[in-house]
């Protein structure tokens, strides 16, 4: 990555960031991928960011774990092109952002695709507020996504133009306490159709016009929470726990589009130990995750007749930072 400090633009301090990794994929794996690419104008009490960086739902509170999923699907995980404005007054920070989709995409009738937000012509909207005082951070946010799943439908070999839209709101609260030796962080998300942030969910078909094939939709709601506790300076033991519950839909549905819509609940626990010295981080981490799979209850979008499947994962990491 490259961080650049530029000359002042009026009264604003200017900076920019470009960061790449080798986690991209296409015709092959381990190809170059753009992580961050943005410029920032900082007036002291306010700042304007233009470009691609972390989705505001990821925000300033994320677990410190070795696994590359960074706590997903309990923690929203996405980098998105955006226009973000922040205003600070005392210990209060207010954030507003309009976002598009690039690498992390919403699910729909054709799987993951950018066309749902492209056809919608409405960006994702986020608004949040944070209280920051010394090592304590407490905040909350609300996010709106509005998608157009389809623009045409076929009924009896006839093609009809349809006007479809699924709009949903998601809410989150978060906290972080950081001292010389302690880090305690937690977040809870009541999410609706947040598949573009690596979370489970989606939406279901609640009605179909028999003449044109136009569909109406009901978003799937999920409750996800996690907590992360880290202690130490050189040797750092840490634990992470996450829980997700499928809350179903507000309406009866006939079919679902999304990720993990056949999962009723998800539980994960992680224990790790890292050794930290200047420029180096060595660590080992064990994770146990259990998912309860089942079948769709069409009356409320919930998952019933479940059975659990567990997965064990061991991660060993060596990081050289410069």
Feature-to-residue mapping (PLM):
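Detector for outer-membrane/organellar transmembrane beta-barrel domains
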Residues: 134-263, 267
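Short sequence motifs at beta-strands and strand-loop junctions characteristic
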Residues: 29-31, 75-77, 119-122, 163-167, ...
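Structural signature of outer-membrane beta-barrel domains
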Residues: 23-25, 55-59, 101-104, 145-149, ...
